[in-house]
């Protein structure tokens, strides 16, 4: 689904329960000057024709590969702490966020962070998730799931700012990622949380 930034509420504002079903909300900014020039260059000559890049079978195979990306127990616990911090920020030394967040992230955010972090790790050519993967994708997964208080909205506080604060305050694990430890832990802790829309 797309949302026009000029009409930020969209045609029909979605309630929280429906927004929660979207895995990601990705904000696409205006293109930079060189990017806009490239758009102009491409479209001024002849409209590009779409060509197939991946087959359906390849896409399914990539989805299967992403679901097999290893999530260490420490990384999974880190994901849970990030989500819990949106519900009870006072428990994570952020009492000032208590009046800011009206509704925190649901368990779908936890599942979404695992799924999106796995996909990002795969894009980076890894078969395991790092805390940096979680941090890189956290705002896209969590920001649209947080409902701010009226006072926070009046103060122009954005959900992304809240996520940035949580990422700064909730410490990531210090990992040791050698293959033997991954394989040993992989046998003990397997996270097969699929993201169900």
Where are the regions that the model predicts?
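Conserved AAA+ ATPase small/helical "lid" subdomain
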Residues: 50-110
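Residues at helix-coil transition
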Residues: 41, 45, 84-88, 143, ...
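C-terminal engagement/docking regions of AAA+ P-loop ATPases
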Residues: 91-197
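Short alpha-helical scaffolding segments that buttress acidic/His motifs in well-ordered protein cores
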Residues: 39-40, 79, 137-142
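Canonical AAA+ ATPase core
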Residues: 1-69, 118-123
């Amino acid at each position: 689904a797309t949302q026009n930034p000029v009409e930020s509420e969209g045609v029909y504002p979605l309630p929280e329960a429906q927004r929660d079903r979207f895995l990601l909300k990705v904000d696409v900014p205006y293109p930079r000057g060189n990017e806009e020039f490239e758009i102009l260059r491409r479209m001024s000559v002849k409209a590009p024709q779409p060509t197939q890049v991946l087959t359906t079978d390849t896409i399914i195979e990539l989805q299967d590969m992403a679901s097999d990306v290893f999530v260490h127990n420490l990384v999974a616990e880190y994901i849970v702490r990030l989500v819990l911090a949106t519900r009870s920020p006072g428990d994570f030394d952020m009492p000032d966020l208590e009046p800011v967040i009206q509704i925190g992230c649901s368990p779908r955010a936890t599942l979404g962070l695992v799924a999106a972090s796995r996909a990002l790790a795969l894009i980076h050519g890894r078969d395991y998730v790092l805390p940096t993967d979680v941090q890189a994708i956290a705002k896209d997964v969590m920001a649209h799931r947080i409902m701010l208080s009226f006072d926070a909205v009046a103060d122009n506080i954005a959900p992304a700012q809240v996520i940035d604060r949580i990422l700064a305050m909730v410490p990531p694990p210090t990992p040791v990622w050698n293959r033997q430890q991954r394989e040993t832990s992989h046998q003990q802790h397997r996270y097969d949380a699929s993201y169900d829309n």
